[in-house]
Each structure stands twice: as C-alpha cells, then as structure tokens.
Amino acid sequence: MRLFTGIVFCSLVMGVTSESWRSFFKEALQGVGDMGRAYWDIMISNHQNSNRYLYARGNYDAAQRGPGGVWAAKLISRSRVYLQGLIDCYLFGNSSTVLEDSKSNEKAEEWGRSGKDPDRFRPDGLPKKY
C-alpha cells in the first residue's frame, strides 16, 4: 500500500500524464528486474571485489530504462544501504572499514545511475558473463 501511495504521490509531484504514468511504472518494474539481476549476480559470482562493479552495473541498467528505472534504482539502493547499515551496526558495531566500504559502494551506485560506464569498477578476472 505504501509503495502504491508513493508512486501516486511521485506522479502527482512530477505532473506525469496518464500515459507517462504507465511508462514510468513500466520502467520502474524493469529497473527492479535489473537491480534484482545485479544482486543475484553478486550472490552467485563469488568473486572478490565484484560488488562495486555489479552495483554500478545494476544501477546503470535500471537508469537506461528511463526516469522510472532511476527512481527504482535509488529506492532499492537506499533501502539496501539502510538495512545493511543496521545489520552491520548490530553485528560489528561502528566499524570504519564497514563505513568506507559502504561509501565506496554508494559512489559506484551513483556512477551507474548517472549513465557513466560501470566497467570502471570491473575487477580483474571477473568472468565475461557478468
């Protein structure tokens, strides 16, 4: 219900017409799929230092969908950062290495959302399928 309310509010604020609203919602759903694929690749790649690249790639792919994709990428990225921060704080306390890693991941996500090439963060040795 909150998601629906948020989408309606965003459409009112942005002055989106009914046709644009449908395309915004479609782009957002496609962006969710792009982000989900990136997070799935993070889980199965099991490659050291691949997180930043895959975060950037997921945000880049979602942003290529349009404004709805950018909105979905921001929402998912911020939710992940918030939840990961809570879990890290609970399990590890306030660690400076956790904070640095979180900041670098956020930088990679913003890089991807801005439409810049995510290959900047690609680690050596990561298989081509990613």
Curated annotation (Swiss-Prot):
Keywords attached to this entry: Acute phase, Glycoprotein, HDL, Secreted, Signal
Keyword Cytoplasm found: no
Subcellular location: Secreted
Record's GO cellular component terms: extracellular exosome; extracellular region; high-density lipoprotein particle
Signal peptide: 1-18
Tissues expressed in: Expressed by the liver; secreted in plasma.
Subunit structure: Apolipoprotein of the HDL complex.
Protein's job: Major acute phase reactant.
Name the record gives this protein: Serum amyloid A-4 protein
Native species: Homo sapiens (Human)
